[in-house]
Amino acid sequence: MNQIRHGWTVATVLSAIVLVGLCSQSIQAQTADPPKQPTDSQKSDTPQDPADVQQLKDRVKQLEQTVDELKKLIGTVETTQQKQQQQQQQQQQQVLASDTSGGLRTVNAVFRTGPPNPSSPRGSVTSSTINTDDEKGERSMDIYGFMMLDTGYSFKTNHPDWFDTVRPTKLPGFEGEFAPNGKWYMGVRQSRFGVKTSTPTKWGELKTIFEFELFGTGVDAGQTTFRLRHAYGELGNFGAGQYWTNFGDTDAFPNTFEYWGPNGLIWFRNVQIKWMPFRGRNELTLALERPGASGDQGVYAGRIELAGIRPHLQLPDFTGNVRFNRDWGHIQASWLLGSIKWKDTDDSDKVDFSGSDVRAGLSLTSVLNFNKDNIGRFQATYGQGIQNYFNDAPLDVGAKANPDFILTPTPHRTEGETPTGSIIPPIVGRAIPVFGMSAFLDHTWSKKFTTAVGYSMLNMENTNRQAPGAFRRGQYFVANLLWYPVENFVMGGEYQWGRRNNFQDTFSSDDSRIQFSFKYSFNKGFKW
């Protein structure tokens, strides 16, 4: 609309200038030299009265004033447009800086360079691949990331591969494990780099995100190495790739420094195909996600009979959520349904340990804007076999005594006869029930200082043939003070605590640490 007004204004000015020029030429032609004696046919058409000449001069002067006014109007319009463009660029930088991956929300997992925004939306992603059928509109690409140093002192100990995190499952499971106590640590593994793009098309907006960090896991656990976080795209209401699980709520993550985060929070990046039929005030999202599970063979872990058991995951996990966004915050309900199967591939005995179980879970989350300075972030989740979706994932499947277990009677056997073993396995696998919760408060003291404080817990309902030292309960607590002295920089101190309780041997362990972190962020947006 501003461009239309601008074009109309320019056209008006040009027309007025042409008209002024014509009138000026007419006056000059009439007043410069004495007119020749007109013929009788010209007398009626040629203005001889000086009043007519003065009237034309007055009209020219009025037109010149009009031109001056229109020039001022053009200057005002251009100034307004420049201010609007500057505001849009600032808003884009603020969204990118907070990375409310709402588009892609990446807390600490959240990429925050300023105090938390109580009204920050969640969203999908925010390509540069252009085809001739694209709708007219603005294309954009954002390059962003941060360099981050974590340093601190751990008063106890944990698994050395996870030296810069607080994970209750990685605390000692027996006396002397990971000894000795007390260590200073430093690392830059949280550092991150990402690219987002947005392209309008006739099918809706095409969005992509490609993001890496330096936090090694899996075979690279403990290393500072590149690790893929997101490789995901959306077109209209459909998305595909690796992105935050649809079973979780990224807005429930607090504004903390500790990398791994609350252990009882659903926090998982998974490969998926997603459909988002409703967005905005009320949202619905459905997805098919890559299945996966981990198993604990408990007191039978050393048995040869169990050596050939392999996961047999034939169906994807089905996840969904509904979300209600309001001025005071939001409420979200998420669900998961899937199947866990395992196959005994060892044919050397007569016992088949193959089995299956259902995995299912329900999660309720909420972000409440108590006021502009206080934001509450809450989650409660219950289910079975869903442990790998939790932030600090213990095992999904545990060994349980089989009540139908019997031995084949062998009262008489001739010499050299092959012994007959059990025909029904002594144990069966069962999906382990689990409950997790997280409750945090983000408080803004001023434009320069914020605090996050809260507690999280995960509790397993262990099966009766798990090992006595199996993980049962984990607890997590964090409190911090963060300082934002200038744009794109934050530093601060944080107290972190974690505790582990075992299943049956009464052993427990904990760790307390003080951490100081320095985050230097960058972002650059391009539009065309």
Q: Where do the model's predicted regions map?
A:
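Outer membrane beta-barrel
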Residues: 128-297, 312-330, 367-382, 386-388
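Bacterial N-terminal signal peptides
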Residues: 11-22
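N-terminal periplasmic/intermembrane-space "pro-region" immediately following the signal or transit peptide
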Residues: 27-162, 528
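Detector for outer-membrane/organellar transmembrane beta-barrel domains
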Residues: 326-471, 528
